[in-house]
């Protein structure tokens, strides 16, 4: 018979293998037969493996029968419930560990911080931070890193920054977390400043640093900065790393530079699911929907399984192309994957069928959703509105309120779009007022555009002009563009020129869409010099070479 030490070595080697649920059950049986079931190390490993395979029942049974629970075992079960988003149980377990003889360690607080950020419980997150400080772990690297990340994810960037600055000697992982936090919260410039400070303090960036640095570059206006980040990746030979490659593809996609995104993608030796998803999303964002569908087809052929978010994006491309054939193919694929009940996928399917003219299919899908939420309602209301079924769309809005759901900005965009398609000016004005007074939602550009279109369609151009001029300055050029379009339709050249002058003051005259409209207005006035100037500039809008920039 093998000694206890030999058995432990055998079991240790077994635990290093990939653990399926069946393998974990075999390991559990072997550990029990070897009389090592009460060994804290193996109990912790088994609980962790059960949790990884989403078998909470077995993990909890193991935890409950174990007499002497180490902090590692507590952490395993807390992590398991946090992974399953059962945060009430997580809190209950934390209360139990505080009452027990076991003292929570830095990993315990790190796990709890992640749980609170996942549930967007900022009050609980602050409370855990306070308890960690009292226990002497507030400035621990692991605990601090998790809390900084949790604060950032919850949008509490000030708290995250204060905690980061209070930690005496942050390691590279903590620097990366803070740079990522700044990027995700929209402070890309602060992330870059921190990146420079990090290097000044003697830390060399790794692949995770560069991924964090790309996180805040999400706008076409930041393309120069994006190129500089890419150049730095090339300089330190990190561009070939799979994580960095995927991040660069995603960065360029969000900056609407699909050519650079494709170039990086093609340089990746074996593009994984993340890289493919990033490029497909980029194609969709840039309006290259056929390319998005083509790459998605290649992804399917390769055997990679997309997630619900990617499927929803691809269905959006089908909707934009009004391609019901591809849409139905994706729907069949969704059923084979078992994703047909996912609320994001269902909502995307409803939107796709509506925009492809198959409203009956959309309504049938909506009826089959077991737990409808505001996203699915929004998709159906928009579909009904686009097809002119205004009364049914407003019935669905009433149903939203009766179910106790809270309408959001998109709900009111869909309702105002419905009013536009059916010419319901009075109803649109009523909805616009209710949005502000009853639901406390501040109108966005899209809502104002619909209101201008409604008034313009009714021929009330002067009223629309007064409405637009009453808005806070500077007025968004999208709203002015909608008014200019209405002036063109009704051939009101006098008002069109006034609106055109406002667009010119906004500095948006350079955009091709406004150049075309403005040139049409000036043509009616016979101002041919202005027409020639504007139309000559259209072909040059994107022809110039941008100057270089470097902040490294």
UniProtKB/Swiss-Prot annotation:
Pfam family, one: E_motif
Gene Ontology annotations for the cellular component aspect, listed alphabetically: mitochondrion
Entry superkingdom: Eukaryota
Xref: InterPro entries: E_motif, Pentatricopeptide_rpt, PPR_At4g14850-like_plant, TPR-like_helical_dom_sf
Recorded GO MF terms: RNA binding
Keywords recorded for this protein, A-Z: Repeat
PPR repeats: 39-69, 70-104, 105-139, 140-170, 171-205, 206-240, 241-271, 272-306, 307-341, 342-372, 373-407, 408-438, 444-474
Matches recorded under Gene3D superfamilies: Tetratricopeptide repeat domain
GO biological process: one example: mitochondrial RNA modification
Residues covered by region (Type E motif): 479-552
Assigned protein family: Belongs to the PPR family. PCMP-E subfamily.
Listed NCBIfam families: PPR
Protein name: Putative pentatricopeptide repeat-containing protein At1g64310
The organism of origin for this protein: Arabidopsis thaliana (Mouse-ear cress)
Organism placement in taxonomy: Eukaryota, Viridiplantae, Streptophyta, Embryophyta, Tracheophyta
């Amino acid at each position: 018979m093998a000694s206890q030490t030999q058995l432990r070595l055998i079991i240790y080697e077994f635990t290093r293998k990939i653990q399926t649920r069946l393998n974990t059950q075999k390991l559990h049986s072997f550990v029990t037969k070897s009389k090592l079931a009460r060994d804290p190390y193996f109990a912790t490993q088994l609980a962790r493996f059960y949790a990884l395979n989403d078998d909470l029942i077995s993990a909890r049974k193991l935890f409950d029968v174990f007499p002497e629970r180490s902090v590692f075992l507590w952490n395993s079960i807390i992590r398991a419930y946090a992974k399953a988003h059962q945060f009430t149980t997580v809190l209950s377990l934390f209360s139990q560990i505080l009452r027990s003889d076991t003292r929570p360690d830095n990993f315990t607080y790190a796990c709890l911080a992640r749980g609170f950020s996942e549930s967007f419980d900022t009050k609980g997150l602050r409370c855990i931070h306070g308890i960690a400080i009292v226990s002497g772990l507030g400035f621990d690297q692991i605990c601090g890193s998790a809390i900084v990340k949790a604060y950032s994810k919850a949008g509490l960037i000030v708290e995250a920054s204060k905690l980061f600055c209070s930690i005496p000697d942050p390691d590279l992982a903590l620097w990366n977390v803070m740079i990522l936090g700044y990027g995700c919260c929209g402070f890309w410039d602060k992330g870059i400043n921190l990146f420079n400070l990090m290097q000044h303090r003697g830390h060399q960036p790794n692949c995770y640093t560069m991924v964090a640095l790309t996180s805040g570059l999400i706008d076409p206006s930041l393309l120069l900065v994006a190129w500089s980040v890419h150049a730095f990746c090339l300089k330190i030979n990190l561009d070939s790393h799979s994580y960095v490659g995927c991040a660069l593809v995603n960065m360029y996609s969000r900056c609407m530079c699909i050519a650079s995104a494709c170039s990086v993608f093609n340089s990746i030796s074996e593009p994984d699911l993340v890289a493919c998803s990033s490029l497909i999303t980029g194609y969709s964002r840039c309006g290259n929907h056929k390319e998005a569908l083509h790459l998605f087809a290649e992804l399917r052929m390769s055997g990679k399984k997309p997630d619900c978010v990617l499927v929803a994006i691809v269905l959006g491309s089908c909707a934009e192309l009004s391609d019901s054939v591809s849409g139905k193919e994706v729907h069949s694929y969704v059923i084979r994957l078992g994703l047909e009940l996912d609320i994001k996928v269902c909502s995307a399917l409803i939107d796709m069928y509506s925009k492809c003219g198959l409203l009956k299919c959309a309504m049938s899908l909506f009826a089959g959703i077991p737990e409808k939420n505001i996203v699915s309602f929004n998709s159906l209301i928009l579909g009904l509105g686009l097809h002119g079924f205004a009364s049914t769309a407003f019935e669905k809005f009433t149903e939203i309120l009766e179910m106790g759901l809270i309408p959001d900005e998109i709900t009111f965009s869909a309702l105002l779009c419905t009013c536009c398609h059916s010419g319901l000016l009075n109803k649109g004005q009523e909805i616009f007022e209710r949005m502000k007074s009853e639901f406390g939602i501040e109108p966005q550009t899209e809502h104002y555009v619909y209101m201008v279109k409604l008034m313009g369609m009714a021929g009330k151009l002067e009223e629309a002009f007064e409405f637009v001029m009453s808005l806070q300055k500077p007025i968004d050029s999208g709203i002015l563009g909608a008014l200019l379009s209405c002036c063109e339709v009704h051939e009101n050249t006098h008002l069109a020129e006034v609106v055109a002058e406002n667009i010119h003051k906004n500095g948006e005259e350079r955009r091709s869409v406004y150049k075309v409209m403005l040139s049409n207005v000036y043509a009616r006035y016979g101002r041919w010099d202005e027409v020639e100037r504007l139309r000559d500039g259209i072909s040059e809008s994107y022809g110039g070479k941008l100057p270089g920039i470097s902040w490294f």
